[in-house]
């Protein structure tokens, strides 16, 4: 009877999914457990990263069910986004048709992997029943003052004639057509995430179940800085430039100011000056560089003098105003003070443009007459008027107080985090539920009129505006306030909005009256185990935390953090690089499943590396896992016939060892899955137990009761990893009930106390023999046993024993000469 994985896997998948085996409700007496993998963009085909992500989640789900939990394990589709629109442009396929076809194919692939989802809870963000509530979320944010519109510089692709999100710009070029990306000033919608910056930062420390590296990444992204906001009067303009600094103690060392080229005051300052033309050319040039390029330490600092001057608030002296590549308009105030003596970036800029360098902090052993680089350390203030002689840490406070008293500044906390730009000039996204009326201005669509549906008949040729702008039946509407003709907002929402609340919708996916019932969300959430790639460590996870806090504040939920525990899995590599079409190193999951089966694919992907590490693909590794499952199959088929003989001998000399190994493996697998996420070592211990079972079968007479107990528990242990073969062998062996309804085995602590132990005997460091001896044997008894052994006697003949070293219960080393 061969291991026919195709037949076995098809049989069990049919049974599971036709019977809704993994459907759950909230009325179970069991404790709840919500395990969730980040839902995929429906590109049409699963890749190995998906297989890894969903296999990890399925181990948790199947394990926790057997541990007695009511497990919610749903799946859905992050279905809006640019690729669908690009497919429409390239192939003439409507984004909706393309997306739903892809969903159908990927759903089939997931079922063929045997992932235990409750498919009754499936959601797709592009379905009107879902995006109706995405639009509802927007309206709640708008009512709470968290959604607003303003002009903003955005990424602009001149070839595609469209705005691009930051993530669609790679090395300064359009991800799709590779054109250089510039900047364009447009009216855009934003979410006021900065209002939540302090809470988002503070509550990171509550996330005990998150990897430290992810918490650090979020802290750095939020980027809290304490300092002062200082105002410099612009000479002759009657306006002020605000700068933020963490070093107000260096204020007397300011010898110039730098504005971002896009700063709203730049054009006013240069207007009519000889430098105007040169500055305008520089501003144009900056539009073709992205933020990473402009702020990189490897990028040469470049600037232009504006011809304007600012008045120093403490000295009254004029300081020149420059524009430069390294200052960004939407970071801080878009302006910085140049203190070349005490900031290395400013030092390099001052040297390049021959600007004065004024030392105002004297550190121990610093030659202030001959600075070779900026001195950024602590010290005592000099050249700082009435503040001379103060320690710089004390001067920070004193100077800030002086500025505040005289109306030139104040103590301030700022964040690197910027408000979330949510407008997208694309078709395939959730329409922003806003109407523009000449009389009433900006008017939100009433909730009862949601969803604002995406029209099907649209033209996808890129023009620089959303395709919706050219769809008259969509654009032309009536004002909900006054009933006069009005125009709909034609931008759609960033797809990150759809994925910032989907985990709530899974709790109540068919509710047509509200996004979710509060009692259901409060029952299931927070998510107990969230699993996804570390590339989502910042944006998706931060936005989800933001959404959760807003919904908590608005009274829709009773908790402030969405994900209790987070596991970020590593990438799947081949030949040391991430799998990609361009490198030609993609391995198709479908081909692996077809050739070896889903259980083999799952086993390899879980065995080859710990979940959080990158995994190197290995054809030999896959073959090895396939051989292991074949060995497992053969053992059970052979033993089934032998165990039908009820007159088997009752005892074997290996019984104690088998019982020990069984209990050890139960303990190891339980802890590796439930506490350490070390699936690879759990599988390794299962493989070792199989090897011993073969030894037991060959060497000992079978203890029927013990071997049946071992075989039964073995299948439960391997079930979360390879469920199809486990279910099939359980049925073949005639074990009682359904393996999916049994309890996870408990280990017997007393069985883990070994009666015998194997001692390796070395002579001059080389293992020459092994002895099976009682655990409590004395050193003298052991020495006698070894010295009486014929093989050892021969090896020691004519030699002098210098030392007899015994490491209890492990080894003996006899040193001879």
From Swiss-Prot:
Its organism's taxonomic lineage begins at: Bacteria, Bacillati, Bacillota, Bacillota incertae sedis, Caldicellulosiruptorales
Family assignment?
Belongs to the class-I aminoacyl-tRNA synthetase family.
The Gene Ontology CC terms held by the record are: cytosol
Q: This chain belongs to which protein, by name?
A: Leucine--tRNA ligase
Motif 'HIGH' region: residue span? Answer: 40-50
Enzymatic class? ligase
What catalytic reaction does the record list? tRNA(Leu) + L-leucine + ATP = L-leucyl-tRNA(Leu) + AMP + diphosphate
Q: Name one Pfam family in it.
A: tRNA-synt_1_2
Motif, 'KMSKS' region: chain positions? 578-582
